[in-house]
From Swiss-Prot:
Name of the protein in its database record: Uncharacterized protein y4fH
Species in which this protein is naturally found: Sinorhizobium fredii (strain NBRC 101917 / NGR234)
UniProt keyword annotations, A-Z: Plasmid
Length: 102
């Protein structure tokens, strides 16, 4: 669990520079209703950005490959990773400055 937490934190803290994580562990795929918490709006496959808030679906990313390879990039959801929009969203999210710099 420590390795898993470290890799998830590394990906989302340094790659996306998010401020908070919402970790969804429900039995079904996460929907915008599941992540309807204060100040969170879900955008494209489990990712939301308002005040640096990111929602993660525990069942949708590839934890097994992440732990086996040590590559924290597997923290992103499978559907987004396979999407042609993924590179666009990486660029879009990386354009946001760190929360405290605003």
């Amino acid at each position: 669990m420590m390795l898993y937490s470290a890799q998830i934190s590394t990906y989302y803290d340094f790659k996306k520079r998010v401020f908070q994580l919402y970790y969804y562990t429900g039995d079904t795929a996460m929907t915008s209703e599941s992540a309807a918490v204060e100040s969170a709006v879900v955008i494209i496959s489990k990712a939301s950005i308002i005040n640096k808030f990111l929602a993660i679906d525990a069942g949708d990313h590839d934890a097994e490959s992440m732990l086996a390879s040590g590559d924290f990039n597997f923290a992103v959801s499978r559907s987004v990773r396979m999407s042609c929009d993924w590179c666009y969203w990486l660029r879009f999210l990386s354009d946001f400055p760190p929360f405290f710099a605003q």
